Amino acid sequence: MKLVVLVALWLWPSSLLAYPTITVLPDEEQNLNHYVHILQNLIMSVPTKEQDLGKKLSSSRTVDSAEPRSLASKVLLTPGLVSAQDVTPESDVLIRPVDETTNSRTRGFTLRRRRTQSTAFWSIRPNNISVVLRTEEPFIEKEPEPELESSRLPTEPEPELEPEPEPVAESRQMSEPEEELVTSTTPNKELTGTSRISSMATQPANTQATRITVTVKTTSTMDVSTDSEDVPQLSGQSEIPSAEDLPGRHSLNTRHEDILKKISNINAEIQQGLLGGNNSPEFKEFIKASREHLKRSLALAAAAEHKLEQMYGSNVFPEGRTSDPDNDMEMIINMLYNSRSKLSDYFNIKRVPSELREKASVVNAELRKILCVDQVEMQSLIKKLLSNNMKILNILNVP
């Protein structure tokens, strides 16, 4: 007790200069001392003694995983089974299985990390008021990914449209001669010895995986169950469905192929029909008749065009051109004479088309002026006829 008092008095000035006076309640101080005592016991009970390496088997593996905490979460630590004398400044850790009666399988092995210089993850202030913990993980060492293994990973090609997609296992790379890990799907297969596990977790192309190297050494029997539910990254089949397995993409792919197939069938039928039709007599007769009809049509078109040229070149339409008046009179008289039987129809306004009625009315008016007298002259003529008739009647009625 005296020694504790002397040490406290000796440390009191330095702590007073480093930290100001803090008022602490008795309950808080008791709780803090209790926590510090628990942490000290936990730190003293961490075993770091290196085990004998002569009886262990060596086989190297590297573990690549996007979730490095999953391995540590499945290991049971037993800090109370090793005495404080086994603690060494090295970073080696001994992990032993817990003796419990459970239905699940237990696994025990020694996890050894490479010797690297690192700071402690805890510290205690001089006045024992607070404890500072660091968040460094002492069991995981990150290393850059080597170029040799990165070259082995083929780039994932884009999914192609195929009618019947077949899932391709991406774990074919694990069957190379460099792999020495033996896995089995049976639940109770025992593996003994020291192994360094190496596998590359399947991830999508747009995510960047963190490469983590963990050295694992086993000192006892270990049961490994590689069921697809427990360890999906080692099962050889990715849980992410590919683009070829989607039902919509498959149906669209089959629809496109059906359309292309129908088009090719129609093209083949057309080619066969053309080749077979050239030899049939009906087809030849049809072609011959079509050619003759085309020739007749071209001849009629040429004749009509020639006739129009003659009409425009003749004096039928003398409008805008100077011509001989005697020839024009002869042409018009001949035309009226040739069409004298249809003049009544031509000059009937009711039968004339609407676009020609105005011109027909002008022609009728001019003909009436020429062929008929005016109304005044007509009335005088009628009066003369009436007077003549009266004279004739008077002469006949003479007694």
Swiss-Prot record:
Residues 136-250 are annotated as: Disordered. One of its GO terms (biological process) is sperm-egg recognition. Residues 157-167 have a biased composition (Acidic residues). Residues 182-206 have a biased composition (Polar residues). Glycans are attached at N128. Testis specific. GO terms for cellular component: acrosomal vesicle. Keywords: Cytoplasmic vesicle, Developmental protein, Glycoprotein, Signal. Residues 207-225 have a biased composition (Low complexity). It is found in: Cytoplasmic vesicle, Secretory vesicle, Acrosome. Residues 1-18 form the signal peptide. It comes from the Eukaryota. Disruption phenotype: Knockout female mice are fertile, while the average number of pups that are fathered by knockout males is significantly lower than that of wild-type fathers. Its main location: cytoplasm. Glycosylated. In testis there are two predominant forms of 77- and 67-kDa and a form of 47-kDa, whereas in epididymal sperm from caput, corpus, and cauda there are two forms of 47- and 43-kDa. Testis forms contain complex carbohydrate residues. Epididymal sperm forms are N-glycosylated. Then undergoes significant glycosylation in the testis and that the majority of these glycoconjugates are removed by the time sperm reach the caput epididymis. Residues 136-145 have a biased composition (Basic and acidic residues). Involved in fertilization ability of sperm. Belongs to the SPESP1 family. This is Sperm equatorial segment protein 1.
